[in-house]
C-alpha cells in the first residue's frame, strides 16, 4: 500500500492482516482496485502461518482478462518479523494466467519513513497507474483480446480457505 502524497495515490492491491490480542493472524483482506476507480475486497479467515485463500473472480481488474476464473492468495507475514510476502495467482480452468508477487518489510508510517522510502525506491504515487497503462498499450498493439468493463460487483466477497486442500497451481 502506497500512502497518499499531495492528494495522489493509486494502489492496485492493499493487504490487511487482522490479528488478535496474542498477535495471531485471524483475517486477511485483499483490497483490489482497477484503473476505472472501482474497488473490491476479498476477505478470508486465517488458519496459521501458511494460509492459502481461494476466491472466485467477480471483479474486473484488466480488460485483457475475462470475467472468469479463480484467485489463489497467500500471505507470509510473521508477527515477529518485519518481512512480508504476498503471492496472488489468477487461474482459469486450472491454468495460471497471471502471477503477482509483492515483497517488502513492514515499517512504521512516519513522514521520515515515507520520504526515505520514496528516495530509496524511486517510487511515486502514480507510478503503478502509469506502468499499467503502458503495459495495456503494449497488449492492445499486440491485438490481445479486449473485454469490456461490466458493472462493479458488491464491495466485498468471502474467500475460501484452501490451505489443507491440494493446490494444483503451486501457490502453497
Q: Language model features by range: what are they?
A:
Residues 1-172:
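Mature, function-bearing regions of proteins
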Amino acid at each position: 500500500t502506497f500512502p497518499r502524497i499531495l492528494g495522489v495515490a493509486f494502489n492496485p492491491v492493499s493487504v490487511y492482516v487482522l490479528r488478535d490480542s496474542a498477535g495471531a493472524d485471524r483475517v486477511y483482506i485483499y483490497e483490489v482496485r482497477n484503473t476505472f476507480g472501482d474497488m473490491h475486497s476479498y476477505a478470508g479467515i486465517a488458519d496459521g502461518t501458511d494460509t492459502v485463500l481461494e476466491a472466485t473472480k467477480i471483479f474486473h481488474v484488466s480488460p485483457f482478462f475475462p470475467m472468469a476464473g479463480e484467485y489463489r492468495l497467500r500471505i507470509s507475514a510473521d508477527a515477529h518479523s518485519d518481512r512480508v510476502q504476498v503471492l496472488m495467482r489468477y487461474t482459469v480452468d486450472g491454468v495460471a494466467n497471471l502471477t503477482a508477487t509483492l515483497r517488502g518489510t513492514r515499517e512504521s508510517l512516519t513522514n521520515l519513513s515515507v520520504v526515505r522510502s520514496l528516495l530509496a525506491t524511486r517510487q511515486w504515487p502514480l507510478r503503478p497507474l502509469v506502468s499499467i497503462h503502458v503495459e495495456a498499450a503494449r497488449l492492445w498493439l499486440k491485438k490481445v483480446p479486449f473485454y469490456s468493463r461490466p458493472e462493479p460487483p458488491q464491495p466485498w466477497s468471502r474467500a475460501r480457505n484452501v490451505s489443507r486442500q491440494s493446490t494444483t497451481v503451486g501457490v502453497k
